[in-house]
Structures are given as C-alpha cells and as structure tokens.
C-alpha cells in the first residue's frame, strides 16, 4: 500500500527552489512548515501557501532538535534540506572560519536534520528525506569553492 504524505518540512527555506516547493506541496494538500535562520522575508509566501515558519539555525544541534520537537503533534513525513551558505572570493583569500561555518550549515546541518527526521520516520515506517544540490557539486565555479564543497 502506498502511504500518503501529510506534512512537509523545508529546512533552509528561501525565495528560490524552497518557495516553489512550498507552493507545490501546499497545492497538493500537504501541511507545510518552513525553517530558516531568518523568516521575515518568508511571511508573504507563508500567507500565500498557508505555511508556517519557524526560526532555526540548521548548524545548531539544539535548534534542530527543538524544531522537530515543536512538530511532534504532526511530525513531518517529507523533509527537504536546502540551506545555502556562501563565502565568495578567490580560493587563496578565503577566510577559513567562514568556510568552516558554511560547511557546518550545508554538510553538518544536513546530518543533524536527517538524524532528527529519521528518529521520527523509522517508527512509522514512512517518510522521505531530500537533499537539494547544485551543479556546483560536480563542477566548482570560480570564487565559489565553499559553496561547491557544501553541495558535494
């Protein structure tokens, strides 16, 4: 039997792909929750799609755990991980601390999010976790090394 999806959580939401997914999921009858470091710019999208927004820094384990705990009444059965952290510039001039923070968001945050999602999906034997990527994952572009590393 194919189980129907009910609640989509998009972590790392912004005006591009995430906004399109919010509209798509909502138009197909799913409850939608958007999580991002800042949600002020997402208010119009939430109103349009009937979505809920929650502030969450995906590189912070406590934030991610609290995000999922706040959704336990109706846990998400679709989780999309779509954050972005970019430090642009020539490779030899990049600040190592900024690059590390970018990897914390793109890679480590993905681990944290997937771990919390799986904890809830396994008992239900149902769910989907999707990680977005970019062409940078297979071809880094000039002045975009940290972005490419995080999308690999």
Describe the residue ranges of each PLM region:
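Active-site loop of short-chain dehydrogenase/reductase
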Residues: 6, 75-77, 121-133
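Rossmann-fold scaffold of SDR-type NAD(P)-dependent oxidoreductases
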Residues: 11, 76-84, 106, 131
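Catalytic loop of short-chain dehydrogenase/reductase
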Residues: 128-152
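Conserved glycine-rich Rossmann-like NAD(P)H-binding loop of the short-chain dehydrogenase/reductase
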Residues: 30-42
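Rossmann-fold cofactor-recognition segment
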Residues: 48-62
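A short, exposed helix-loop element centered on a Lys and neighboring polar residues
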Residues: 114-115
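Conserved glycine-rich cofactor-binding loop
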Residues: 14-15
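Catalytic Tyr-X3-Lys loop
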Residues: 85, 92-111, 130
